[in-house]
């Protein structure tokens, strides 16, 4: 099918963002925590897959990882800074747990008739440098995202005297900068000295381009989540 990868990537944005909001609608705060764990683990696996889309080769994982920023922004908007930071800590712990479990598989000696140990090792035997770079970048950019969201919120409320308005500004103002930090920190820590600097530059530009699009596209979903919370106050009182 022509443009199959492009179609799937665009559709996945709506699927992942919509899925997160659905988790919130049916399970409240716990649904957002659960989604954070799911997207953290899935992104670690997806990032190993290289696809050709929009004229360039790129790794998967960017879109579902972007939904983790939507999760913290929804948590900030509805439940506050403390719960948003808790969401980030759950994501960090899920990341560490997945890395430790997946690496422990390689301590076993496969049976003579085993046919899966080799492929599994190929998939999950990431270099420690890449795994640590991913974990560090996630922790830094997500914590910054929560801080920036509430910094923007405090500024707009003080300047305009309205706490409810300018959701779009605090959402995009925090996420766009956080995603830039994520792209720069991860790629420099993971690939400096591995790839030529011009290649790293291309990865940075294309990766951040994807995050700009997903960051702008997630704004309606924050509004939708807030609307759901207003119509269903029991989700907030849990």
Label each residue range with its predicted role.
Residues 1, 5, 17, 150, ...:
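Alpha-helical transmembrane segments and their cytosolic interface
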Residues 1-75, 82:
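Hydrophobic transmembrane alpha-helices
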Residues 7-11, 33-34, 63, 88, ...:
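Hydrophobic alpha-helical transmembrane segments
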Residues 36-48, 91-103, 177-179:
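Small-residue-rich segments of transmembrane alpha-helices in multi-pass membrane proteins
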Residues 45-56, 78, 100-113:
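Transmembrane alpha-helix boundary signature
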Residues 82-90, 163-170:
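Membrane-interface alpha-helices at helix entry/exit sites of multi-pass transporters
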Residues 89, 93-112, 138-146:
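Transmembrane alpha-helix/helix-exit interface in multi-pass inner-membrane proteins
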Residues 104-129:
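Membrane-interface interhelical connector segments
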């Amino acid at each position: 099918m022509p443009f199959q990868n492009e179609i799937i990537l665009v559709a996945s944005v709506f699927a992942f963002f919509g899925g997160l909001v659905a988790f919130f609608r049916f399970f409240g705060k716990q649904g957002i925590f659960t989604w954070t764990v799911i997207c953290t683990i899935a992104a670690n696996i997806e990032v190993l897959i290289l696809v050709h889309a929009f004229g360039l080769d790129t790794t998967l994982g960017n879109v579902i990882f972007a939904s983790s920023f939507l999760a913290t922004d929804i948590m900030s908007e509805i439940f506050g800074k403390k719960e948003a930071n808790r969401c980030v800590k759950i994501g960090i712990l899920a990341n560490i747990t997945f890395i430790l479990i997946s690496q422990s598989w390689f301590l076993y000696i496969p049976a003579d008739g085993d046919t899966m140990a080799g492929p599994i090792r190929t998939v999950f035997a990431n270099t420690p440098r890449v795994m640590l770079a991913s974990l560090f970048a996630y922790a830094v950019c997500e914590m910054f995202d929560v801080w920036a969201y509430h910094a923007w919120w405090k500024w707009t409320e003080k300047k305009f005297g309205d706490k409810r308005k300018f959701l779009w500004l605090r959402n995009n103002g925090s996420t766009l900068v956080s995603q830039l930090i994520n792209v720069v920190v991860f790629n420099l820590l993971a690939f400096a000295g591995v790839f030529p600097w011009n290649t790293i530059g291309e990865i940075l530009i294309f990766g951040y381009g994807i995050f700009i699009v997903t960051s702008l596209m997630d704004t309606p979903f924050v509004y939708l989540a807030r609307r759901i919370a207003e119509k269903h106050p029991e989700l907030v009182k849990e």
